[in-house]
Amino acid sequence: MTQAASRRRRAVPAVLAGAALLALTGCAEPRQAPGLEYPSAPAQRLPEAAAPAEAPAPGQPWAPIAGLADEQWLEAVADRTGIPQRALAAYTGAALLVEQTRPECGLGWNTLAGIGQVESQHGTYADAQVQPDGQVAPAIIGIPLDGSPGLAEIPDTDGGALDGDAEWDRAVGPMQFIPATWELYAQDGSRSGASDPHQFDDAALTAAVYLCESGEDLTSDEGWVDAVVAYNQSMEYVNDVAAHAQDYVSPDGPSAADSSY
């Protein structure tokens, strides 16, 4: 960690993206390691774009984010990393769009992929699949946040509209948002006219916006850790996401060539 990153962490936003405040909440089982410290920020990478990214004319919507990265690049990196190509298209499209709208954030696709792996195994947890349109089916819904040991206590905030539970909130979708966070940050990455936490493009873009709001500059150790801590305060979680994010852009992979900030 840099000296700045070793300072006491800034206060975490009151509403976290992930399922719990006290424990690991992703559907995937994180690697456990005693005596951890906050990690250094993994290298942040951008994919090869399908075409030069240009801002739309005023009042014109962005294209669906799944088409923003180069198709051949997606195929090669999906094959190398094992990330489902449709999920990878969502991560990379979100990173490319945020690079245009918030270039100071420095968010790489690999950080989104690291979170997606830990939270839901890229939308494949419990035999779920990512459909060609980006919908994850069956829907991935976490356990009730009822204050059980290691879990936050979050009474229902959405009448069960997103998570099917009118008593307790649950994290939902491939990026595992709690309903209150989704209500605040929801994005329409698929350009369908609605935001859906179970649609990968919407979920990935929402995660990108949330991370940038929480960490500001994700190329710095402090900014990256602050962003991921906003998703989940567990040090094991943060280290697990960092390890996956760095693995996905290993130097001998096609994703590492001339695509960094």
Where are these regions (language model features)?
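Secretory targeting and sorting signals
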Residues: 1-31
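N-terminal export signals and maturation junctions of secreted/periplasmic proteins
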Residues: 29-99
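Catalytic glycan-binding domains that act on GlcNAc-containing polysaccharides
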Residues: 71-73, 78-261
